[in-house]
Amino acid sequence: MEDADGLSFDFEGGLDSGPVQNTASVPVAPPENSSSAAVNVAPTYDHSSATVAGAGRGRSFRQTVCRHWLRGLCMKGDACGFLHQFDKARMPICRFFRLYGECREQDCVYKHTNEDIKECNMYKLGFCPNGPDCRYRHAKLPGPPPPVEEVLQKIQQLTTYNYGTNRLYQARNVAPQLQDRPQGQVPMQGQPQESGNLQQQQQQQPQQSQHQVSQTLIPNPADQTNRTSHPLPQGVNRYFVVKSNNRENFELSVQQGVWATQRSNEAKLNEAFDSVENVILIFSVNRTRHFQGCAKMTSRIGGYIGGGNWKHEHGTAQYGRNFSVKWLKLCELSFHKTRNLRNPYNENLPVKISRDCQELEPSVGEQLASLLYLEPDSELMAISIAAEAKREEEKAKGVNPESRAENPDIVPFEDNEEEEEEEDESEEEEESMAGGPQGRGRGRGIMWPPQMPLGRGIRPMPGMGGFPLGVMGPGDAFPYGPGGYNGMPDPFGMGPRPFGPYGPRFGGDFRGPVPGMMFPGRPPQQFPHGGYGMMGGGRGPHMGGMGNAPRGGRPMYYPPATSSARPGPSNRKTPERSDERGVSGDQQNQDASHDMEQFEVGNSLRNEESESEDEDEAPRRSRHGEGKKRR
């Protein structure tokens, strides 16, 4: 297909029509004029062969026929790195012949010789990891195989000196020298001299590289030894894995040289301290997946040793008494590096799965400690050594660092226990003062309605459900009003409210500073006994009366702080209080029952302070109990 301007868009139209020639480009169909073809083809062939072949310096990089082009599947065209011509001399090697040494296909067009395959260098050295699948030729050498040391030495030489003996590296070094000289003045005598210089440079470079490799592979023994960490003590050792709940306690132990474990583990460590020369503690902080170091136990547990303001986690057992330790090694050893170590003393589980003060089998503990010494020191090692030197200096000066007077921040364990007991007692007192129905927290929160029993005779109207619990107590949770037991002020100066937040709910819900102030013209007396309240016929719920004004400094709907159980029989007979009233016992019981039906909830919604202030409240409840029994 040709355009009007003579442009051809048939890219591979002349692939099979042109003559076969040893060019890298795709052959183009010759024009119709044979004379012009004879003139143009020969220079084109010579030019391509000269440029591609590099003027006789080597074969073209397109020296192998493209396998995909033979099957008509190559889509790269001129960009393909293989030859798109059928040339038997440049055919690729048959894969079956390369893998199995034979090819059973009669019409196979590929090569069946190993001459053009490059020799495998790894196989020449003695071992090829690719085996029979290697793309290079495996030529067996005569004689016995070389020793392993010689093979390793040759491999090291290849990896070390490959950069110095690389042809590209040599060409880069020689190219600037050749470019500096004129093209026509390159003498033939200079070539041996340059080659000799190159050989000398190549000999010097391997020596230098060998010296550098020896320095890197064989580190200085002085640098290899840890100057800061202390070696493991000689003798009989017992090893224990110690768990720390947090990193703060671990760093505090590094600074002060003490540790404290749970009281259940103290006997175990004391027994080990008395039985062997050295007790080695290998520490691991929880949730770090690392071992942080090891220390030697230097004192029994039981004597007073100052220091260690340990941080307790919520819900964990408290620590026991302090004991001194000497830090030997501080580092970061990953659990992954200890995955092959298992502890026979712990059901043969990995050492990373250990409880606090879990003893390790001596050989396993020694291996774990040796792994710690292979890791570099952490920053805490220098801190530990500095703190230890400071303690030694203070001992030399006669200063006792464990003195309580000189260390006011350090509190002994027994004093800690006493303070904690006092705090618990004070918290219990505050909770008892706060009252149960105010919720779990301290202070005036939202008050939950108590499950109070209804007064005697309280029944809902016919056809209605029972009264919900939310209306029988402080369910409004209105945050304002008079201050409570803790003296909370009235933020808006509202004073006591006559009703709840949404008006009166029941017949006895009128409680205000002035009776009837919300309903002018109504009598200030209470609702008649057994009359119609706001709930209709029958007895209304006795939630107090209109004349029952709230008391200052007390919440209006405060629930009772005591249980609703009746008082004991000791309060039933109170002759002193009955004499004060000047009436008989029967009259007192009748008055008490009548008063309690009207003031039952109002009296029950008072706390223990009101009971202690007013002497008339307790006898009413006790006598009301007798009245019920006599009825």
Swiss-Prot record:
Q: Which family does it belong to?
A: Belongs to the CPSF4/YTH1 family.
Biased composition of type Polar residues is found at 216-231
Q: Where is the composition biased (Basic and acidic residues)?
A: 392-407, 573-583
**What are the Acidic residues biased-composition ranges?**
412-432
| Protein name per the record | 30-kDa cleavage and polyadenylation specificity factor 30
Q: Which residues carry this modification: Phosphoserine?
A: 610, 612
Swiss-Prot/TrEMBL induction comment: Isoform 2 is up-regulated by exposure to the oxidative agent methyl viologen (MV).
SMART domains listed in its UniProt record? ZnF_C3H1 (SM00356)
Enumerate the PANTHER family for this protein: 30-KDA CLEAVAGE AND POLYADENYLATION SPECIFICITY FACTOR 30, YTH YT521-B HOMOLOGY DOMAIN-CONTAINING
Question: Which part of the chain is the YTH domain?
Answer: 237-372
Gene name linked to the record: CPSF30
> Per the record, a Pfam family?
YTH
> According to the UniProt entry, which residue ranges have a biased composition of type Low complexity?
182-215
- Which processes are annotated in GO (biological process)? mRNA 3'-end processing; plant-type hypersensitive response; positive regulation of plant-type hypersensitive response; positive regulation of programmed cell death; regulation of salicylic acid mediated signaling pathway; response to oxidative stress; RNA processing
Summary of activators and inhibitors of this protein: Endonuclease activity is repressed by the N-terminal domain of FIPS5. Nuclease activity is inhibited by zinc (>100 uM), cadmium in a progressive manner (50 percent activity at 1 mM Cd(2+)), and high salt levels (e.g. KCl or NaCl >600 mM). Stimulated by ATP in the presence of Zn(2+), even at inhibitory zinc concentrations. Elevated temperatures prevent RNA-binding at 55 degrees Celsius, but endonuclease activity at 70 degrees Celsius. The sulfhydryl reagent dithiothreitol (DTT) inhibits both RNA-binding and nuclease activities.
**Where is this chain compositionally biased, Basic residues type?**
621-631
Which tissues does the record link to its expression? Expressed in seedlings, roots, leaves, siliques, stems and flowers.
List every stretch annotated Disordered: 12-38, 179-234, 392-447, 541-631
